[in-house]
């Protein structure tokens, strides 16, 4: 994994996040809180274990994983998923699977910013983070 992903990132823009959360099945109350949250994401690495910690006024979450190995994840909206993160073409690609559903979260670096594309069925959300 490129060390360029490592560090602290702050959300600066978000498009279609409410629609994405609806597609995930997130209720109105949780969506309202999620839309207000301006998360900070901290990506670190120790050996071959990558940790992504997301901190916000809504909820803090943390996942630690090895590339290509499935792990159990409890998401900020309390979904229990089987997740796998891979690296391809300079992008960190995360797939979450639960109850017959699947969503993808792709992270890539563009002009020094981390662009995160979240997809569920035909709904796509784009969130942009700047390094702090």
Swiss-Prot record:
Record remark on domains: Forms a beta-barrel structure that accommodates hydrophobic ligands in its interior.
Protein name: Myelin P2 protein
Keywords noted in UniProt: Acetylation, Cytoplasm, Disulfide bond, Lipid-binding, Transport
Record-linked InterPro entries: Calycin (IPR012674), Fatty_acid-bd (IPR000463), ILBP (IPR031259), Lipocln_cytosolic_FA-bd_dom (IPR000566)
Listed GO CC annotations: cytosol; nucleus
Binding site for hexadecanoate: 107, 127-129
More details: P2 protein and myelin basic protein together constitute a major fraction of peripheral nervous system myelin protein.
Subunit structure, interactors included: Monomer.
Positions carrying N-acetylserine: 2
Organism of this sequence: Equus caballus (Horse)
Stated family: Belongs to the calycin superfamily. Fatty-acid binding protein (FABP) family.
């Amino acid at each position: 994994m490129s060390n360029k992903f490592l560090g602290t990132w702050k959300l600066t823009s978000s498009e279609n996040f409410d629609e994405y959360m609806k597609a995930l099945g997130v209720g109105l109350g949780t969506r309202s809180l999620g839309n207000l949250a301006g998360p900070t994401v901290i990506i670190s690495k120790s050996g071959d274990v990558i940790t992504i910690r997301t901190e916000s006024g809504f909820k803090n979450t943390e996942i630690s994983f090895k590339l290509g190995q499935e792990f159990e994840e409890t998401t900020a909206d309390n979904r229990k998923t089987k997740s796998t993160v891979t690296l391809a073409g300079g992008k960190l690609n995360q797939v979450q699977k639960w109850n017959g559903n699947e969503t993808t979260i792709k992270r890539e670096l563009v002009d020094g910013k981390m662009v995160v594309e979240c997809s569920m069925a035909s709904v796509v959300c784009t969130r942009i983070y700047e390094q702090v």
